[in-house]
Amino acid sequence: MPEGKIIKALSGFYYVLDESEDSDKVIQCRGRGIFRKNKITPLVGDYVVYQAENDKEGYLMEIKERTNELIRPPICNVDQAVLVFSAVQPSFSTALLDRFLVLVEANDIQPIICITKMDLIEDQDTEDTIQAYAEDYRNIGYDVYLTSSKDQDSLADIIPHFQDKTTVFAGQSGVGKSSLLNAISPELGLRTNEISEHLGRGKHTTRHVELIHTSGGLVADTPGFSSLEFTDIEEEELGYTFPDIREKSSSCKFRGCLHLKEPKCAVKQAVEDGELKQYRYDHYVEFMTEIKDRKPRY
């Protein structure tokens, strides 16, 4: 039976991109009753086996094992996430970026940081601050790009990342995710709204999750991570989602060190020595407190 990937889910129909070589055929499929019975919901991003009824319609027969699964947005088998943050309007926030990075890392998704609206910076201090932060994150090992959707050349280095990958765009509302995607692939024609001056953040303009062909891969312009809570991350797992902390933690005296009040902690020493940025450690402590204070689930 043929195989494919769900690229859109709408009103009980699943649109499957046929995975045959050089095929761009999309089949409209319904799920089998067995999925409902077993409480399995097909998701955008699922690799599936389907049975074709004709050239345009069919039935989902099997859902392959997922490498990861996001709840909000409901999508799975994501290879990478482009985290879009604006330099200004709204202001750049390392705390919010680190929160997104933790959630992405926890799902084994490769993050790419994109700071947009560089053309809207009006003073040198802000420019210098953004450049310094970009260098900090590059030193951790992240790909960081400074862009403007009006400057096509600033986007050129991002485009090769999309080849043969399933990519999610995420980030603060109002930072220009749709504008950025439209600049990369003008044929998408995604809706963009002006930023809401009153709220200081943009209105969500994306209605549903859909994987769209662009630059040799599949890209989802999602409503973003509408939930930024650490509901599935445990205390001992948090450090692994900070690559810079993870690297230093191997030198801690005690196994299971949470880098809070433990003696001979290599992470705290690295902060003191300037090898680990204070703001990164502060965010780690803030997130750890949040996880510790989380109400138990039964």
UniProtKB/Swiss-Prot annotation:
CDD domains: S1_YloQ_GTPase, YjeQ_EngC
Keywords attached to this entry: Cytoplasm, GTP-binding, Hydrolase, Metal-binding, Nucleotide-binding, Phosphoprotein, Ribosome biogenesis, RNA-binding, rRNA-binding, Zinc
Any GO MF annotation of the entry: rRNA binding
Compartments where located: Cytoplasm
Consequence of substituting residue 178 to A: No GTPase activity. Wild-type phosphorylation by PrkC in vitro
Manner of cofactor binding, per the entry note: Binds 1 zinc ion per subunit.
Record InterPro entries: G_CP_dom, NA-bd_OB-fold, P-loop_NTPase, Ribosome_biogen_GTPase_RsgA, RsgA_GTPase_dom, RsgA_N
A Pfam family assignment: RsgA_N
Entry comment on modification after translation: In vitro phosphorylated mostly on Thr (with lower signal on Ser) by PrkC in the presence of poly-L-Lys or myelin basic protein, dephosphorylated by PrpC. Most in vitro phosphorylation occurs on Thr-166, in vivo phosphorylation has not been detected, but it might vary during the cell cycle.
NCBIfam families reported for this sequence: ribosome small subunit-dependent GTPase A
Record's function text: One of several proteins that assist in the late maturation steps of the functional core of the 30S ribosomal subunit. Helps release RbfA from mature subunits. May play a role in the assembly of ribosomal proteins into the subunit. Circularly permuted GTPase with a low level of activity and slow catalytic turnover, does not act on ATP. GTPase activity is stimulated by the presence of 30S or 70S ribosomes, phosphorylation increases stimulation.
Protein name: Small ribosomal subunit biogenesis GTPase RsgA
